[in-house]
Amino acid sequence: TLKQEVERLEELLQLPTRPDYRYEIARVVSRDFNSWWQHLEIRKGGKHGIPTGAPVVFSGGVVGRIIEVHEYTSTVELLSNSHLRMAVIIAGDNRPMSYRGSGFQTLQNPVGIAEYIPNDINIDDPSNPPRIITSGMGGVFPAGLPIGYLRRLRPGASGMFQDGDVYLDKRLARLTEVAVLIAVEGNYQ
């Protein structure tokens, strides 16, 4: 049945229960080599209740957000896209920082950039780097979704903060199925 298929896919994607959202599982149907780290197309659209601005996730965390909705497909702006920006925090530290995609990537490890990192943050153990998660600010991404790991720090332009490289999940390069988070109430505009 359809319900069993949804349960199978949710288990496959290992998505946590979120009472304020429902998951709409979608297959990745198109990804252009010229914009591999910028956008992808999914086979769910307006007919399936997909709203513009909705977060897109997989078991490794954030994939991106819906930027264009058609009748049966939608375009996802990826986490690695330099136009995608969001408020983030380091897990266990509630001070907000800014995240943005770094734009051009190779087909290896996708990397983003964290900005406004407090100067007292260090990477003490490279084998256990600080984990970057969504802060919940901004109204699009709920709090606590994994983004990646903070790997390299450097002085920020103002000298008051640091900037750093955020290593994203390698599986972002080969996604075949994702989940769109749709708020039970409200919209994303």
Feature roles, as predicted:
Residues 8-189:
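A secondary-structure micro-motif
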